[in-house]
Amino acid sequence: MPRYKTVEQVLSLMKDVTRVRNIGIIAHVDHGKTTTSDTLLAASGIISQKVAGEALALDYLSVEQQRGITVKAANISLYHEIDGKGYVINLIDTPGHVDFSGRVTRSLRVLDGSIVVIDAVEGIMTQTETVLRQSLEERVRPILFINKVDRLIKELKLSSQEIQKRLIDLIIEVNNLIETYGEPEFKDQWKIKPELGNVVFGSAKDKWGFSVPMAGKRGVKFSDVVNAYTSGDKAKIEELASKVPIHEALLDAVIKFVPNPRDSQKYRIPKIWKGDLDSEIAKAMINADPNGPIVMMINDMKVDPHAGLVATGRVFSGTLRAGEEVWLVNAKRQQRILQVSLYMGAIRELAEEIPVGNIAAALGMDAARSGETGVDIRFKDSVLGSFEKLHYISEPVVTISVEPRNPKDLTKMIDALRKLSIEDSNLVVKINEETGEYLLSGMGFLHLEVSLQLLKENYGLDVVTTPPIVVYRESIRNKSQVFEGKSPNKHNKLYISVEPLNNQTIDLIANGTIKEDMDNKEMAKILRDQAEWDYDEAKKIVAIDENINVFIDATSGVQHLREIMDTLLQGFRLAMKEGPLAFEPVRGVKVVLHDAVVHEDPAHRGPAQLYPAVRNAIFAGILTSKPTLLEPLQKLDIRIPMEYLGNVTAVITRKRGKVINVVQTGNVARVYAEIPVGESFELASELRASSAGRAFWGTEFSRWAPVPDSILVDLIMKIRERKGKPKQLPKVEDFIS
């Protein structure tokens, strides 16, 4: 099918929302996700049939092609016919490596269905479980593709009966996850049932695949598959691919089981839109109204060397056209759309308009970042905080400092880092004001390594880096007394105490149930019912910062307090960015303002006076409340032959890790463990060495946990020394005179 014709067809079909499907392909790293996408692409006539699988057309960054893993979510629109009717399938390829799971979260928001790819030999790995859980939370309907079935024959030498048993076991495992994480109203209808055709078995590399109904129609049995591979005749595998082509099996399943945007928005909008569901804007989204006010949710920002910043996202209401004025809800900025287009692989094709339910690319929204929402400018006052924030499963926990090898490249490097952090909102770029270092924080070592390679390839920058540093958090374990914080001019006094937040509160804030901009009574009710708070105290929460600390105003009748409250809250946020122990962010602390004396003259109560007063009282409180450091822990999920179990558990224990569970199936042990990120630098090579290269494993961020007391002081000193701070522990007297 010639390519130019496809663009026209795709654009005309996009106008009929019942003919549109938005899907993603999600899987663990290396389970064959991008190869699957390529095979689908080839069938749409967008890359040639011959090179699919080798082309890795969606892995369009050369970093991805060298490493053979997908780093960016790429978008593409495919064309597929079923029973003579044409459909547009918007396909978003998402990364499977844990360091990039922030991108998966952003992609899921714009999907209605997902193809979950599982390697028939490795089965369900950590990442598969995480991403399936995320997709069920976002009400994205899964269909299953069990890939690499050829490995069961070539490597494990299974018979056709044994293969079928293995596949049934995998389906049961997936259904158990849907039972665990699915919402009650969806889980039964979303479960995988082979006889319906919502699971496909095949090999993306060899381009064959079938569902049970398709195999019945075409007269293909598992024994035919076994014969094709055991005969050693390549032609038999090719014959299989022409009889049951994988793209047909998968795309037929997508059209049949993934809902169109009009159907899916009816149940997805109530989940992701937290505003009034009877408002005009919510109704337009629920009904996928092409004539409604424009609402576009942005899941990706890319820097195009020629066009500038390109925002990619899904149109949830209205029709996107150039010249529209939109309001960016998070950035609180008005922007004008200059151009709209659709994706064909890495190439954007211009379009006059992109209607509701589709994935669009737009120029002109330079202030947007992924997770942003653009709405019709007329509705700017009615959408504040109405979209549920995206929840990332991990947070940046590893930092390196970067400097250009050639000092002349400094401004070029600053510009490149800025662009990288726009494209990847899980990459944090900071400047250490005192040392002038440029710090880059990411989700893990691979995440940073790939970012450095992008600096080199896209911007021609050669940089020097420090070894990776783990990011810590400061916290407390007791309640403090009330401390008086004085302003430098002694005219303002604040009376503040601190105490630790309980785990329920931290979880409620981390998962977005409790948000700063919620109604106070609603927040207090949730905290009382789910986190053991006193209702009246919870009503007095006035701020929640990004590291999960809360500020409570427990004062009554203090003169001039309202006029300075904004300044106090800024002071609180600043103090919590760098705690007193090691200048690391503070996490999980409740700060209570009991009383205050405020000077009547505004000239005597500006930020220069109030910031130190807030900070000093909070820091004195922290230092007297059994302060500690929290370190990030990683979950490990390792599969190894039984004979290596002892060696592998020894590696985990040596790295201050602990084994949580070991499950044995046949000769394979599956080890679940937790290990501090700080100890995981050489983990890959040690696991390989201890298992003769036969360990499969996955990692993901688990939680923050207190550093053992035995190494606490030593660690604080090391961090202070690295940051050029005095090598002694701070004392209360340093903050309270």
UniProtKB/Swiss-Prot annotation:
GO MF, one annotated term: GTP binding
Pfam families xrefs: EFG_C, EFG_III, EFG_IV, GTP_EFTU, GTP_EFTU_D2
SUPFAM superfamilies, per database record: EF-G C-terminal domain-like, P-loop containing nucleoside triphosphate hydrolases, Ribosomal protein S5 domain 2-like, Translation proteins
Membrane-spanning residues: none
Binding of GTP, residues: 27-34, 93-97, 147-150
Main subcellular location of this protein, as a coarse class: cytoplasm
Subcellular location: Cytoplasm
GO CC terms, sorted: cytosol; ribonucleoprotein complex
Residue stretches making up the tr-type G domain: 18-262
Residues with Diphthamide modification: 604
Alphabetical UniProt keywords: Cytoplasm, Elongation factor, GTP-binding, Nucleotide-binding, Protein biosynthesis
Known role: Catalyzes the GTP-dependent ribosomal translocation step during translation elongation. During this step, the ribosome changes from the pre-translocational (PRE) to the post-translocational (POST) state as the newly formed A-site-bound peptidyl-tRNA and P-site-bound deacylated tRNA move to the P and E sites, respectively. Catalyzes the coordinated movement of the two tRNA molecules, the mRNA and conformational changes in the ribosome.
UniProt family annotation: Belongs to the TRAFAC class translation factor GTPase superfamily. Classic translation factor GTPase family. EF-G/EF-2 subfamily.
Name assigned to this protein: Elongation factor 2
Species of origin: Sulfolobus acidocaldarius (strain ATCC 33909 / DSM 639 / JCM 8929 / NBRC 15157 / NCIMB 11770)
